[in-house]
Regions:
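Hydrophobic/aromatic beta-strand patches that form the interior of the parallel beta-sheet core
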Residues: 21, 94-96, 123, 127-129
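Structural signal for well-ordered, non-membrane alpha-helices
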Residues: 8, 53, 156-160
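A generic structural motif
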Residues: 14-19, 120-122
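Hydrophobic alpha-helical membrane-association signature
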Residues: 2-4, 41, 107, 155
Length: 170
């Protein structure tokens, strides 16, 4: 999803250190709460999220929700339970959802519920994009629609602002 690439690029331009996990990196085994030892790909995901002060999660609508691969990856974040900040505790999470029709709102709602369950803070702005709006983002993360670019700017400001504020509380 090029929307995630665009958001990651904008975060980097705002001064954030970024790591992007795409579809290939989410090819994980099914989540099991009783894994004796996490597979290497899961350890990498969990380790990067453990270091993160904020996240962006992007998803297409899959029949009123998100993809199984994304939900599975988010489930593995429970394995941060032993960390100083378990799950997504107090981390701002920007959300992006793209859909052919009105389903982007459903995907966004599903993402918000999952992020809340993990203790994260979904940003006030969650972006829903139609296929036409997604097409305004090229493979390099450039956004040709001023309206879409403005929304992304607000989302990035919210993630950076919440992460900054939290870092000054601890």
């Amino acid at each position: 999803m090029w929307a995630l690439g665009a958001a990651t690029r904008m975060l980097a331009q705002a001064g954030a250190e970024t790591v992007m996990f795409g579809v290939a990196e989410l090819d994980l085994p099914p989540y099991e709460p009783d894994f004796q030892e996490l597979p290497p790909a899961v350890r990498r995901l969990v380790g990067e999220v453990r270091r993160a002060d904020g996240l962006i999660v992007a998803a297409p609508d899959y029949l009123g929700g998100t993809s199984g691969a994304l939900k599975n990856a988010l489930d593995f974040l429970w394995d941060l339970g032993e960390a100083a900040r378990p799950g997504l505790d107090a981390r701002p999470v920007g959300l992006l959802a793209c859909a052919e029709g009105p389903g982007a709102g459903d995907a966004l709602s599903a993402l918000r519920a999952t992020v809340h369950a993990l203790g994260g803070w979904p940003t006030p702005l969650g972006i829903t994009l139609s296929r036409q709006e997604c097409a305004a983002i090229d493979q390099y993360g450039a956004i040709s629609s001023p309206g879409v670019a403005d929304q992304f700017g607000v989302l990035i400001d919210q993630i950076m602002g919440f992460a900054y504020a939290w870092s000054h509380l601890i």
